[in-house]
Amino acid sequence: MRLRNVVGAKDIINANIYINRGIDELPNKKTYLEIGMGKGDFIIANAKRYPNINFIGVEKYDSVLVRAIEKIDEDLPNLKLLRLDANTIDTVF
């Protein structure tokens, strides 16, 4: 995947309710973690399909994370996204 600069990516990420907050408030006990979620197709589809399971997606690159945010077209309380380098994941969990 070729990374492209997205103008205003940091502002979009900082304003989004799904990013880097509320992980400890997820509604379900069962949780799946996807490291390197890319543009989010897989994790968003599964969050819609399985509302009783939590999904946490991790992505390192702002421009890719913005593309995932743009695909969220409904309220998904069981989905959270982390803008994070997977090498530092132990600081979150």
Where are the language model's segments positioned?
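S-adenosyl-L-methionine
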Residues: 1-31, 41-48
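A short acidic, Gly/Pro-enriched loop at the edge of an enzyme's catalytic core
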Residues: 92-93
